[in-house]
Amino acid sequence: MQEFTNPFPIGSSSLIHCITNEISCEMLANGILALGCKPVMADDSREVLDFTKQSQALFINLGHLSAEKEKAIRMAASYANQSSLPMVVDAVGVTTSSIRKSLVKDLLDYRPTVLKGNMSEIRSLVGLKHHGVGVDASAKDQETEDLLQVLKDWCQTYPGMSFLVTGPKDLVVSKNQVAVLGNGCTELDWITGTGDLVGALTAVFLSQGKTGFEASCLAVSYLNIAAEKIVVQGMGLEEFRYQVLNQLSLLRRDENWLDTIKGEVYE
């Protein structure tokens, strides 16, 4: 797509601080490395600021939340806000957990660069009817017309923030732009952590100076296109997971990968 410029090669090996869950931690670390940056995962409040202060972007994922992790998240988010450090917040599980939803709403005061979630999570967060269960989106929540209008209103309240909403059609909404993106494959739903990985990749592109809107579009498209390149091979679950990470490191060598992004950007 002509709207975006190729972020590769990565200009510097940025440090990406991920406060995330134990299930997808290894996948995120390898995905960040595959793009040419360096990951660190520190969620102990005694040291969290030491790592956040050295980082070029912060990714906060609410999976496996605990009181200690919440303390670390609040400390890191506060520092990111004070120092203008790019920050991605992934609203995992807010459809089910009132604690997580309350935390995300508090984190809005720290002005994250990108707020990410699946269709059900974002609908829940902005007060729309939803059918999400656990941390998964519901097929009943894929209507976008009412969601887009509410997100546009929210972007007026939080003008520096972009929304990244994952689903069969991925949505990226900022104050002045909307993208509806169509890459991807259902096989990505077979393995845990791919949604978390999108958030981490968004942080990578933010560390390279991309806006929240650009970084979100690039991240979700990059992972989806990488997956599209291998799905035709008809492989098993673990092999598919392995090859997704493999393609993340290979796709950046393709100078024309942006041409395979499917979707539209509206002003």
UniProtKB/Swiss-Prot annotation:
**Catalytic activity, EC:** 2.7.1.50
Question: Is Kinase there in the keyword field?
Answer: yes
Which parts of the sequence bind ATP?
116, 166
Pfam families hit by this protein: HK
Q: From the Swiss-Prot or TrEMBL record, give the protein name.
A: Hydroxyethylthiazole kinase 2
- Please, one GO biological process term? thiamine diphosphate biosynthetic process
Ranges annotated as spanning the membrane: none
Which residues does the annotation say bind substrate? 41, 193
The catalysed reaction is:
5-(2-hydroxyethyl)-4-methylthiazole + ATP = 4-methyl-5-(2-phosphooxyethyl)-thiazole + ADP + H(+)
Q: Which cofactor does it need?
A: Mg(2+)
Report the pathway entry. Answer: Cofactor biosynthesis; thiamine diphosphate biosynthesis; 4-methyl-5-(2-phosphoethyl)-thiazole from 5-(2-hydroxyethyl)-4-methylthiazole: step 1/1
Keyword Transferase annotated: yes
Query: Species name for this entry?
Result: Streptococcus pneumoniae serotype 2 (strain D39 / NCTC 7466)
Which InterPro entries does the UniProt entry name for this protein?
A: Hyethyz_kinase, Ribokinase-like
The family annotation for this protein states: Belongs to the Thz kinase family.
